[in-house]
Design a protein with these regions (language model features):
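Non-catalytic DNA-recognition/assembly elements of restriction-modification systems
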Residues: 4-115, 246-283
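Basic, amphipathic alpha-helical recognition segments used for DNA target recognition
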Residues: 1, 7, 135, 140, ...
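Short, surface-exposed beta-edge/turn micro-motifs
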Residues: 123-126, 162-164, 191
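A generic structural signal for residues embedded in beta-strands
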Residues: 167-168
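A short, polar/charged loop-to-alpha-helix boundary motif
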Residues: 178
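Short, charged beta-turn/beta-strand-edge "cap" motif at the junction between a beta-strand
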Residues: 171-175
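Sequence-specific dsDNA recognition surfaces
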Residues: 101-117, 132-162
Length: 283
């Protein structure tokens, strides 16, 4: 272990502590935003929802569905009674319930096409982020997508910017992330759906989609006989409540955006600490 001057060690120590403190503050703001959302909609813990089944004495879960409610879906998981309870609860105290695809909520929902990837050296490529890395603040980038060969696809389907909302569409379906500033211009896998939010609602959209209630509605849309997945159309029809109290909705939005900025500042401090350590190792 290299022994650095005390002043340098203290600088690195302070930067790491400040970085973790900012992460904690960010997480607290996200929790605060979701708590406000639950309070405004008067939502119970989702585990306290106990759906009613058709026959309680049958020995197995059973329920009926009206033909008019099939929505071209014959898979039982789409029609589970708890889903109806979730929709009823988010609707009860909302001004209205619309969908993520509503033009007031999102400008665009992008599902990239499947393509053969060409990876290159970092100076010739764009950082490429896979679905399994999307929940990390500072994912280790090992692959760079060719700028030359994938220029159009990167611009139209893969490139992300601060406050885009990402949803995993396979694997662990329904993971949600809001893009931090240091991911600007990165390319994100075609296995992640990108939502370009309308101005002034990105934070609220993230707070809602990352809730247990939204997760139930996201996973309701799963389809596939071999590989479970969702797509851009699935995300577009996910119900989302609009709050009666616009001030509360704006506050939720602001809390999340502040939290996202804190995550970025935490990243910068962490990088500063790493750079100082590298200077010690290289001298």
């Amino acid at each position: 272990i290299p022994i650095a001057p005390e002043s340098i060690k203290q600088e690195i120590h302070n930067l790491v502590i400040e970085s973790f403190d900012l992460r904690d503050q960010s997480n607290d703001l996200i929790d605060k935003a979701q708590k406000l959302l639950y309070q405004e909609l008067q939502l119970p813990d989702i585990n306290d929802i106990h759906p009613k089944y058709h026959s309680e004495n049958a020995g197995f879960r059973n329920f009926t569905v009206k033909v008019s409610n099939l929505n071209w879906r014959l898979d039982a998981s789409y029609h589970l009674p708890n889903i109806n309870d979730v929709i009823e609860l988010i609707s009860k105290n909302a001004e209205e319930v619309t969908t993520v695809g509503d033009s007031r909520i999102s400008n665009k929902i992008i599902l990239a096409g499947v393509f053969k990837r060409h990876y290159v050296d970092s100076k010739f490529g764009v950082p490429f982020l896979g679905g399994r890395d999307m929940m990390q603040l500072n994912p280790k980038i090992e692959k760079y997508l060719s700028k030359e060969l994938h220029k159009d696809r990167i611009k139209k389907e893969l490139e992300v910017f601060e406050n885009y909302v990402l949803v995993s569409d396979r694997g662990t379906i329904g993971k949600v992330q809001i893009v931090p500033k240091h991911w600007n211009h990165w390319a994100v896998s075609q296995n992640v759906i990108k939502i370009i939010p309308k101005e002034g609602i990105a934070g609220y959209l993230y707070a809602y989609l990352s809730s247990d209630y939204a997760l139930a509605l996201i996973r309701r849309e799963i389809y596939g006989s071999v590989v479970d997945m969702i797509d851009d159309n699935s995300v577009a029809v996910i119900p989302i409540p609009i709050l009666k109290n616009k001030h509360i909705q704006e506050t939720i939005n602001d809390y999340v955006l502040q939290a996202n900025e804190m995550r970025y500042q935490a990243y910068l401090k962490e990088q500063d600490a790493i750079n100082k350590m590298n200077e010690i190792l290289n001298n």
